[in-house]
Amino acid sequence: MLRKILAGVVLVSSVAYAPLFAQTAGAQSAQPSTDTKVDYSDGKSWLCRPGRHDACDVDLNTTVVAADGKLTSERWSADPNAPIDCFYVYPTVSTDPTPNSDMNADPAELNVVRTQFARFASKCRPYAPMYRQITLAGLRRSLVTGGTPPWGVGPQYNDVRDAWNYYLQHDNQGRGVVLIGHSQGSFILIELMRNEIDSKPVQSRIVSAILLGTTVAVAKGKDVGGTFKNMPLCHGATQTGCVMVYASFRSTVPPPANTLFGKVPEPDMVAACTNPAALGGGSGPLHAYLSTTGNLIVGNATPKPWTSTGQTIETPYVSVPGLLTAECATNENATYLKITVNGVPSGPRVDDISGDLMAGTQVQANWGLHLIDVNLGIGNFLDIVGQETKAYLAKAKR
């Protein structure tokens, strides 16, 4: 099933990622040996670990832009005494010219950690291993040969598995842990969970799994029985050991027939969707953290001024309460997280957001809002993880 989904991703990537591929097309290099194991006892093999000045020790202060245009500051800080851990696997961003990345972080890898993961350090101890992921150049090479990147097989998977096992043996000490991934990171985590966690003793330590920008199958009318045997979807913020998953699309640009996400080939299965703004169902307000300057996980977008007065915003992120709402939806092509922008064109605050994947001036509708999947719901996830942590610790005391 995952292979069929990924085949669709590859076919459309040639168009959607064309500007990025152009950067690497003439610079592909021979792949260094990936036969050796990465030494995860070496701190350099981790982008983030607790108590360090590293990729998670960054400025995440935010300007809150109210609907009336008023600006207020929101300070951010990590919690060095967080009672649980988070383990994060990042998406395809490496600009290395080889099919798989090396173990030296490039600016894109540092950027995506800041964008998607560092903020979780306010709720959990952060663990983010580097891994020899399939690069943008490697994805392009797969397109040329007509193949599908084997996200779940090879050095990229082996590295994450080894990092996870090192973490369990040397760092976890029986603590609860949240798994967090996006895109390639989610595909790898899915395989890790299927092979190493689901239905095994370590499953009891999973507070939850946040798997975004991917597709998870569940049996129709049920929360399990597809991708996972015994890890259900989350339906409440105090539920633990469960999975949250979505792929986001604008309400005005729903998944087309060739969508990359939100559909599964098996007739008795459906693609899962959990809305972090309303886990129990229905619509709810998103607590998004968006880049002030339009910085995305790959590339940049040019945002509109955040206020009609053009006030200077000096923080790297903005929050826009009330602008965005989300609801799980299904059309004839997919099940997805429908993002509604509640902008007022004549109002003092910005009335739209950036984040569509573009090829030139053309929106790639089949990708949805893949580039900001995490940004859209990260504030909601922080609240959920906080509530889940209390529930998990209460169960552990029994």
Name what the model sees in each region.
Residues 28-74:
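N-terminal module-boundary/linker segments of secreted carbohydrate-active enzymes
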Residues 26, 77-78:
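Sequence/structural signature of beta-propeller domains
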Residues 154-173, 194-359, 391, 395:
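Surface cap/lid and interfacial helix-loop subdomains adjacent to catalytic sites
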Residues 44, 50-52, 78-82, 88-176, ...:
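Active-site catalytic motif of lipid deacylating hydrolases and related acyltransferases
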Residues 89, 180-182, 209-213:
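Short His-Asn-centered micro-motif
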Residues 1-4:
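Positively charged n-region of N-terminal signal peptides that target proteins for export
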Residues 13-23:
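C-terminal segment of classical bacterial N-terminal signal peptides
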Residues 181-185, 189:
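Gly/Ala-rich beta-loop-alpha elbow adjacent to hydrolase catalytic centers
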